[in-house]
Amino acid sequence: MWIIPVSANERFIPLELFTGGEIREDTEIKFTKANKIFGEKKRKKIVGPEDWKNPQTGKTIKVYKRTRKGQSGLKTQLFTVTNDGQCIGRVWDSRRGGRIIKNGCKFPLGIWKEGETRSFEGSSGGKPRKIELTILKLGKKQKDKVKFNWKLYDGSGKLMDDNDYTFSAGKAMTKLNDKKISK
């Protein structure tokens, strides 16, 4: 799918760090099998890849399905590789009646540097959104955990969400620091 060369002061972030799958030594982003229950309370699960047909475009793509059991029921999100292999992002979210997401970016993929920030333009439910990812801690090896900041802005540039995430090899997401935004 995507094969990426790595040089000094940067690191390849594999898709398997997001899914909790076994991390390979190569630098290719590919859809490997995932079936992982994770999180402190073991209420989150990621499975895939599976085929999903976008109801707006009719196009079928490979996705991972992530679910979370919560007080308000089951939340389901579908993720795929986006932004020319720079991210894995949501394409669908069950909340608020279900939303199609275009050009989502929820987790960095491929070559990144510690301290690097990248911005991505997309939409959620037809509303324009900007996403900003900043690598906070990277490590040197593909099996090292990754900590990053994820910010979501609305079409006018107002900050809507600001979270720090940590993902660890074989475990998927291991920490979420939700910085409450005053609305």
Show which residues each predicted segment covers.
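Bacterial N-terminal signal peptides
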Residues: 1-2
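Acidic, serine/threonine-rich low-complexity disordered tracts
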Residues: 9-75, 98, 125-183
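An acidic-aromatic
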Residues: 71-104
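Generic detection of short hydrophobic beta-strand segments and adjacent strand-loop junctions
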Residues: 79, 118-120, 165
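Short hydrophobic/aromatic-rich beta-strand segments that constitute the beta-sheet cores
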Residues: 86-94, 120, 148-150, 173-176
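Solvent-exposed helix/loop surface patches that form functional interfaces
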Residues: 93-141
